UniProtKB/Swiss-Prot annotation:
It comes from Listeria welshimeri serovar 6b (strain ATCC 35897 / DSM 20650 / CCUG 15529 / CIP 8149 / NCTC 11857 / SLCC 5334 / V8). Belongs to the ChdC family. Type 1 subfamily. This is Coproheme decarboxylase. Keywords: Heme, Heme biosynthesis, Iron, Metal-binding, Oxidoreductase. GO terms for molecular function: heme binding; metal ion binding; oxidoreductase activity, acting on the CH-CH group of donors, oxygen as acceptor; peroxidase activity. InterPro entries: CHDC, ChdC/CLD, Dimeric_a/b-barrel.
Amino acid sequence: MNEAVKTLDGWFCLHDFRSIDWAAWRELNPANQELMLNELSHFLSDMEITKNIGEGEHTIYSILGQKADLVFFTLRDSLEALNEVENRFNKLAIADYLLPTYSYISVVELSNYLASHMAGGEDPYQNKGVRARLYPALPPKKHICFYPMSKKRDGADNWYMLPMDERQKLIRDHGLIGRSYAGKVQQIIGGSIGFDDYEWGVTLFSDDALEFKRIVTEMRFDEASARYAEFGSFFIGNLLPSENLSKLFTM
């Protein structure tokens, strides 16, 4: 049997995509709308406290197209903590007007294809560079791109039948492309084998949305993607600071 990849695991992630029920929202009187927005604001203030003490992260983006209107991206140190955030959000009055369209569960991961190289032989969980990857600070970039992906198991193109050294080489070469976009694109990889329908959830952040097109295009021509990758739907959006939520919902 081929050697399975080992991973270092950090924060658990929830991408929660919602569509706004504008027809129902318009039926509310302004006073009720304001009460709901105030309740949402208090919820987000509590989320900010968690972020400030280093126990999690979160961000909100406005999604383009008809797949969703918003994504709430939350990171926590356990599935229980993540579920608590999800349940509390669903109990907000405004949640009745934010209809779920898609979600994705994963855990920030770094594989031993890369982790041992980054840690340089020390305990990787004590390495600052590794910890920054596993427990990332979400950048306030203008744009987000999220997509799920898996590795193929199709005849001769079966990633999981490749020897470890060949997989390491392919991932290393693939990673060189990503590193060439340092400073332009920040990437968070969430492992989701056994958690969701695909094997990874990829989240990209950038101040220039065209960088998403460039990096994904370049990676498509790399063997690790061209031969062995399968992709789900792509979601792209614009940063929505919490202080701008009221403006979004104002009729």
